[in-house]
């Protein structure tokens, strides 16, 4: 005989199951809609990013509450108010000011669990003082594709509408350079190329400085642009590629990381890589002998994509908020220098 005190009747079991199902459905609905038990939508928290010192500027720009909304990032607040250190969700430090000691790390006690972000868009060759920053930073914001917050100098995005016509060409190759040092590989390669083809040089080093818009207009009249980076490092592809060449409407002749790094961010037929040639003479012969049909193929990407630049530090810092939910908690860069030099 069944003991009624130990086992509920079938009807009671059914009622209990229905009640539990209703409760679970309600909880699931609250979770999906972000609603509080009272029915009102649960407020979404705003992420506050404290910029400890603004890059390259003694006076930071205006940072209204909707700054990041302009870049498609909601519920993100940028501030330079250091009194908010204790309550900031993350604090970001631009390395150049730490390197030159124009700025220092906070003297106040670091809030427990607060992530600190190391930010730099410079190459390792122009970065010093990382050794004293062991165990300080949790996240990295840089051009490196393996950064916690990856911020490229530019990227290709789907184009809406037809591409603008290609600018008329009157010259073969151009180069804009401000820092001209004989020991740099780019200077050595330029001098070798100049023995075999004409390269028109602009910029401070040539005594012909150009404003940003002037640069684009000047380069647009050339078939090729020497997108030579000042140093060769992993993923270091700067505005020399994105703005000075692709945006201007010239085919970039690139000197920088290996071809694979460029192919990770642009079509393989959108640029000429110097490493594909055994000598400067071979490269010069390739450029000077290219017919119009072959040349036009280097612009096939323009039918599908447009260039978007990321040059505004406000947008770069807003990217921290965009990545914030996915960023690794508890991570510490014990050897930031070793990571960055790799």
Swiss-Prot record:
Its EC number is 2.4.1.-. Keywords: Disulfide bond, Glycoprotein, Glycosyltransferase, Membrane, Signal-anchor, Transferase, Transmembrane, Transmembrane helix. Disulfide bonds join 68-76, 211-214, 318-321. It is a single-pass membrane protein. Belongs to the glycosyltransferase 10 family. It comes from the Eukaryota. GO terms for molecular function: 4-galactosyl-N-acetylglucosaminide 3-alpha-L-fucosyltransferase activity; alpha-(1->3)-fucosyltransferase activity. It catalyses: an N-acetyl-alpha-neuraminyl-(2->3)-beta-D-galactosyl-(1->4)-N-acetyl-beta-D-glucosaminyl derivative + GDP-beta-L-fucose = an alpha-Neu5Ac-(2->3)-beta-D-Gal-(1->4)-[alpha-L-Fuc-(1->3)]-beta-D-GlcNAc derivative + GDP + H(+); a neolactoside IV(3)-alpha-NeuAc-nLc4Cer + GDP-beta-L-fucose = a neolactoside IV(3)-alpha-NeuNAc,III(3)-alpha-Fuc-nLc4Cer + GDP + H(+); a neolactoside VI(3)-alpha-NeuNAc-nLc6Cer + GDP-beta-L-fucose = a neolactoside VI(3)-alpha-NeuAc,V(3)-alphaFuc-nLc6Cer + GDP + H(+); an alpha-Neu5Ac-(2->3)-beta-D-Gal-(1->4)-beta-D-GlcNAc-(1->3)-beta-D-Gal-(1->4)-[alpha-L-Fuc-(1->3)]-beta-D-GlcNAc derivative + GDP-beta-L-fucose = an alpha-Neu5Ac-(2->3)-beta-D-Gal-(1->4)-[alpha-L-Fuc-(1->3)]-beta-D-GlcNAc-(1->3)-beta-D-Gal-(1->4)-[alpha-L-Fuc-(1->3)]-beta-D-GlcNAc derivative + GDP + H(+). This is Alpha-(1,3)-fucosyltransferase 7. It comes from Bos taurus. Catalyzes the transfer of L-fucose, from a guanosine diphosphate-beta-L-fucose, to the N-acetyl glucosamine (GlcNAc) of a distal alpha2,3 sialylated lactosamine unit of a glycoprotein or a glycolipid-linked sialopolylactosamines chain through an alpha-1,3 glycosidic linkage and participates in the final fucosylation step in the biosynthesis of the sialyl Lewis X (sLe(x)), a carbohydrate involved in cell and matrix adhesion during leukocyte trafficking and fertilization. N-glycosylated. The keyword Glycosyltransferase applies. Inhibited by NaCl. Inhibited by GDP in a concentration dependent manner, with an IC(50) value of 93 uM. Also inhibited by GMP and GTP. Inhibited by N-ethylmaleimide. Activated by poly(ethylene glycol) by enhancing the thermal stability of FUT7. Activated by Mn2+, Ca2+, and Mg2+. Both panosialin A and B inhibit activity with IC(50) values of 4.8 and 5.3 ug/ml, respectively. Inhibited by gallic acid (GA) and (-)-epigallocatechin gallate (EGCG) in a time-dependent and irreversible manner with IC(50) values of 60 and 700 nM, respectively. Glycans are attached at residues 81, 291. Residues 1-11 are cytoplasmic. GO terms for biological process: fucosylation; inflammatory response; leukocyte migration involved in inflammatory response; lymphocyte migration into lymph node; positive regulation of cell adhesion; positive regulation of cell-cell adhesion; positive regulation of leukocyte adhesion to vascular endothelial cell; positive regulation of leukocyte tethering or rolling. Its main location: membrane. Expressed in thymus, spleen, liver and lung. Highly expressed in the thymus and lower expressed in the lung. The chain crosses the membrane at residues 12-31. Pfam families: Glyco_tran_10_N, Glyco_transf_10. The keyword Transferase applies. It is found in: Membrane. One of its GO terms (cellular component) is membrane. Pathway: Protein modification; protein glycosylation. The gene is FUT7.
């Amino acid at each position: 005989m069944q003991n009624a005190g130990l086992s509920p009747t079938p009807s009671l079991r059914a009622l209990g199951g229905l009640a539990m199902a209703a409760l679970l459905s309600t909880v699931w609905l609250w979770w999906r809609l972000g609603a509080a038990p009272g029915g009102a939508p649960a407020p979404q928290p705003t992420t506050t990013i404290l910029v400890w010192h603004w890059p390259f500027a003694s006076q930071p720009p205006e940072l209204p509450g909707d700054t990041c909304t302009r870049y498609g990032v909601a519920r993100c607040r940028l501030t330079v108010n250091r009194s908010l250190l204790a309550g900031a969700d993350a604090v970001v430090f631009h390395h150049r000011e730490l390197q030159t000691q124009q700025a220092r790390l906070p003297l106040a006690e670091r809030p427990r669990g607060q992530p600190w972000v190391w930010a730099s868009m410079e190459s390792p060759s122009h970065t010093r003082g990382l050794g004293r920053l062991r165990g300080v930073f949790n996240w990295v914001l840089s051009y490196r594709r393996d950064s916690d917050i990856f911020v490229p100098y530019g990227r290709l995005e789907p184009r809406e509408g037809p591409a603008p016509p290609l600018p008329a060409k009157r010259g073969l190759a151009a180069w804009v350079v401000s820092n001209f040092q004989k020991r740099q590989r780019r200077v050595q390669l330029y001098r070798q190329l100049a023995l075999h083809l004409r390269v028109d040089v602009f910029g401070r080093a040539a005594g012909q400085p150009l404003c940003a818009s002037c640069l684009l207009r000047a380069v647009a009249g050339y078939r090729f642009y020497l997108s030579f980076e000042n140093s060769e490092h992993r993923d270091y592809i700067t505005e020399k590629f994105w703005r000075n060449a692709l945006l201007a409407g010239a085919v970039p002749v690139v000197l920088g990381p290996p071809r694979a790094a460029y192919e990770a961010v642009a079509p393989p037929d959108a640029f000429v890589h110097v490493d594909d040639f055994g000598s400067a003479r071979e490269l010069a012969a390739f450029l000077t002998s290219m017919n119009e049909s072959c040349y036009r193929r280097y612009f096939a990407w323009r039918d599908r994509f447009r260039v978007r630049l990321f040059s505004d530090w406000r947008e770069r810092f807003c990217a921290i908020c965009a990545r914030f939910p996915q960023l690794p908690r508890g991570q510490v860069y014990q050897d930031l220098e070793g990571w960055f030099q790799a």
